[in-house]
Each structure stands twice: as C-alpha cells, then as structure tokens.
From Swiss-Prot:
NCBIfam families: PRK00702.1, rpiA. InterPro entries: NagB/RpiA_transferase-like, Ribose5P_isomerase_typA_subgr, Ribose5P_isomerase_type_A. This is Ribose-5-phosphate isomerase A. It comes from Cupriavidus taiwanensis (strain DSM 17343 / BCRC 17206 / CCUG 44338 / CIP 107171 / LMG 19424 / R1) (Ralstonia taiwanensis (strain LMG 19424)). The gene is rpiA. Homodimer. Its EC number is 5.3.1.6. One of its GO terms (cellular component) is cytosol. Keywords: Isomerase. Belongs to the ribose 5-phosphate isomerase family. The lineage of its organism: Bacteria, Pseudomonadati, Pseudomonadota, Betaproteobacteria, Burkholderiales.
Length: 228
C-alpha cells in the first residue's frame, strides 16, 4: 500500500473509533495536517452526532466548515473527550514530534484539554528514537536569533522555516518557526521542558509531557492499535 492509502486507512479507523467512543452531543477535537484532513473527510459522514468541533488551525477550521461542522472556540468548551491528530514521529512511549504543518501551539493547547489523544499515523512515523524529522519550535519573531543560538548550544541546527514563495513562514499566531535538525531525542520529556523554558519560545513541537493515549498505526497488515 502507498503512504496515501495507509493514511486513508488509518483516518477511517479513527472515524470508527470516535463513532464508538465519543458520546453523542460531545465536542470533537481535531488536529491539522494531511492525515487529519482525511479524518475530517471520514468523520463528516456522521457529523450530526457531535455538538461541534474544536480545531487546531485555520486550515482545519475551513475544512470542517466545508463539511458543515460547527466549529467552536475553545473558550466556549468545557470538555473534549477525544482529540485526533497526526504526528511527524512517534516513539514507543507515545511521545511525538509534531508541527510539520505549522500548528504545533494550537495542537498542544487543544490536546491539553482533551481526555484522550488519539494519534493517527502511517507506519513510517513510528521510530525508535525521534530526531530524524527536524524538530519545529514556534518562536516570537524578535527572539528568533537569540533562540537559535540556544538551540545550537543544545546541539541542534536550527533553520528558519520559509514559504514556497521564499518568504518567512508565519504561524496562525503570527510567529515564526525554527526547524531544528541534528537532535537525537533520547529524553523527550526533558528536552521539551528545556526548550520551552527558553525566553522567546512559544512552544516546541515535542508532545511528551502530554503524549498520545492511543496510536492507530496504518501498516500493510491493516491498522494496529496501541494504548499507552
């Protein structure tokens, strides 16, 4: 199966999961990215079961609204039973690298409110040690150079994310992203705390302190479920 076929397979499995596990009238938490987009498409078939959805990005909001979902502000919501999102890397403990799509801060906020984080990914995302995928760090623009020096001191090679058109990439929050290569992430919880304490960092794309509760992994043998 191709990677796109695996993503579609696991997105449908996640839709089946929330249909069974999320009570009618509840609010659904929805992530960002190519796999999350396929999940939105799949879960739209029974969108009327939900009171609405909380989205982690403007892009996901647009896709949800195109399907007729009511998109709610997180400040209006008391509880999110399940948050569904993809990952750029995930290890055996359920810790993840996220932020390839640029929505890491809002993803982390919505995930922090959810009772369960369901990660959906194809088999290539499951790794023994994270770090091959450059680690995204969202940064206040004025602190870009100072934060880059701190990340270099940690052994990383930060690079400012650019758009396809050659401009500086800006997040939905108006910040910039440093993508940090060269890090061997053998202590994801510790590294998440260390980078988040650097002045000017909004958040790092490490989801270890609040990792996945469930992994739905698309493989050539079907969808494998892991509970953490």
């Amino acid at each position: 199966m191709t990677q796109d076929e695996l993503k579609a397979l696991v997105a449908q499995a996640a839709a089946d999961y929330v249909k069974q596990e999320v009570p009618e009238g509840a609010v659904l938490g929805v992530g960002t990215g190519s796999t999350a987009n396929l999940f939105i498409d799949a879960v739209a078939a029974f969108k009327d079961r939900f009171a609405g959805a909380v989205s982690s990005s403007e892009a996901s909001t647009r896709r949800l609204q195109q399907h007729g979902f009511k998109v709610l502000d997180l400040n209006e919501v008391d509880e999110i039973p399940v948050y569904v999102d993809g990952a750029d890397e995930i290890d055996a403990s359920g810790a993840m690298v996220k932020g390839g799509g640029g929505a890491l801060t809002r993803e982390k906020i919505v995930a922090s409110v959810a009772r369960r984080f369901v990660c959906i990914a194809d088999g290539s995302k499951l790794v023994q040690t994270m770090g091959a995928f450059p680690l995204p760090v969202e940064v206040v623009p004025m602190a870009r150079a100072a934060v880059a020096r701190k990340l270099q001191a940690l052994g990383g090679q930060p690079r400012l994310r650019m758009t396809k058109e050659g401009g500086i990439y800006k997040t939905d929050n108006g910040n910039v992203i440093l993508d940090v290569a060269g890090l061997k992430i053998d202590d994801p919880r510790g590294l998440e705390q260390t980078i988040n304490q650097v002045p000017g960092v909004v958040t790092v794309g490490l989801f270890a302190l609040r990792g996945a509760d469930v992994l739905l992994l698309g493989t050539g043998d079907g969808v494998q479920r892991t509970d953490y």
